[in-house]
Design a protein with these regions (language model features):
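Jelly-roll (double-stranded beta-helix
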Residues: 1-59, 64-85, 93-171
Length: 171
């Protein structure tokens, strides 16, 4: 990868804010790197939980966010405020919730060909896992909408087998 000169991230955000749109609102900052480095803006409308085979680094630049996680079978909210950073351990299911006007930086390690990311959904009434899909992520910007579309178009996958609650697509 050729050397890329330093750039002002705040200026980049100001000039590219329109790219940080729902449902995920992320924009890859560097191509051909060993890391996936993304600017991510709110609001987002995610109900999925991501399972990353390696750690994820979060740095909240503007506004606050809540990282919903599943830890030891319990749903746990991790608030990350402007100026704060957080290192999420590998394989912890997580769902970033970003309000309007928020912007963060997320860094992940590129996956090897043998590694798969997971995306799961949990019943909003009882917490039971509704569905899990594992995929080899090549292009997160194009693959996430496809994964979400498959889940939300399936009534069977959105219906809880424990309590019968049906998850609706995010607004």
């Amino acid at each position: 990868m050729p050397a890329i000169p330093p750039f002002n991230l705040q200026r980049w955000i100001a000039q590219n804010r329109s790219l940080l749109k729902p449902p995920v609102g992320n924009k890859l900052l560097f191509e051909d790197s060993g890391f996936i480095i993304m600017a991510v803006g709110g609001p987002n409308s995610r109900k999925d939980y991501h399972h990353d085979p390696s750690e994820e680094f979060f740095f909240q630049i503007e506004g606050n966010m809540v990282l919903k996680t599943v830890q030891d079978g319990r749903l746990v909210d991790v608030p990350i405020n402007a100026g704060e950073m957080y290192l999420l351990p590998a394989q912890v299911p997580h769902s970033p919730q970003r309000p309007a006007g928020s912007v963060g930086l997320v860094v992940e390690r590129r996956r090897g060909p043998e590694e798969f990311d997971g995306f799961s959904w949990y019943c909003e009434n009882c917490g039971h896992q509704l569905h899990m899909e594992r995929v080899a992520v090549g292009n997160i910007e194009t693959q996430l909408p496809e994964i979400f579309s498959r889940f939300y178009s399936s009534l069977a996958q959105r219906t809880c087998s424990v309590c019968g609650t049906v998850m609706q697509a995010p607004a």
